[in-house]
């Protein structure tokens, strides 16, 4: 089996804490819509609280309901737009920053991330990642059905990096979707378990169990030396 020559990373909760982005977005929404939501600090705090409940997929709708406000599709759409287009202040996990510095030049590096393109590129730019990867793919730019676990982004990034599937390793955090495609393609798969990760306890579907699990990216070199 060929040695790994390319490492492809997930972004959210793999390289930086996704909560940082979400909480930045809630603050932006709270400020812009203070006429409807009241005190921005209180409103942002309410959204942060709802984020850690079953209301996470519909925080804005739940917030309006808590306040006894009508479920205005127009208002919610504007809140979502503000959230997705805000310019975040976010930071890499220290081990991610160190790993990228250590691996750059030793391996070809790629990034695959799901989500609205405008949001994901804003994150990438806030983290100054464009020059730290040899190839970056935002799956929503490939088509509406190309998010993980669809294999298209994985196949494309291997082509762009000029490597064969057995030479690829993929590092992600979410077993519910991250590892199905790279497992099927014959990649080495590694889950990073972030204790503050949103999807830490997600269950892997059939074919989606990662080959390796680590608690810090400092352990990645040791894993790859065993492949």
Regions found by a protein language model. Give the residues of each.
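Alpha-helical elements of Rossmann-like donor-binding domains used by nucleotide-donor carbohydrate transfer enzymes
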Residues: 24, 28, 46, 59-62, ...
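Asp-based, Mg2+/Mn2+-dependent phosphohydrolase catalytic module
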Residues: 1-4, 101, 108, 117, ...
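N-terminal helical cap/lid subdomain that shapes the substrate entry/recognition surface
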Residues: 2-94
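Class I S-adenosyl-L-methionine
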Residues: 27-34, 61, 65, 84, ...
């Amino acid at each position: 089996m060929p040695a790994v020559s390319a490492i492809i990373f997930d972004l959210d909760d793999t390289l930086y804490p996704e909560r940082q982005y979400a909480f930045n977005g809630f603050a932006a929404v709270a400020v812009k819509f203070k006429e409807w939501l009241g005190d921005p600090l209180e409103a942002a705090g309410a959204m942060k609280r709802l984020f850690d409940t079953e209301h996470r997929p519909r925080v804005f709708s739940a917030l309006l309901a808590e306040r006894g406000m009508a479920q205005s599709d127009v208002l919610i759409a504007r809140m979502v737009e503000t959230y997705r287009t805000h310019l975040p202040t976010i930071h890499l996990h220290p081990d991610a920053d160190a790993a990228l510095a250590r691996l750059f030049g030793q391996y070809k590096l790629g990034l695959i991330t799901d989500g609205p393109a405008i949001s994901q590129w804003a994150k990438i730019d806030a983290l100054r990642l464009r020059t730290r990867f040899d190839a970056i793919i935002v799956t929503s730019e490939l088509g509406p059905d190309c998010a993980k676990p669809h294999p298209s982004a994985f196949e494309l990034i291997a082509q762009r990096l000029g490597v064969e599937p057995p030479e690829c390793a993929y590092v992600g955090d979410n077993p519910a979707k991250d590892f199905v495609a790279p497992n099927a393609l014959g990649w080495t798969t590694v889950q990073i378990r972030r204790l503050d990760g949103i999807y830490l306890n997600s269950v892997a579907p059939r074919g989606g169990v990662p080959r390796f699990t680590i608690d810090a990216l400092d352990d990645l070199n040791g894993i790859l030396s065993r492949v």
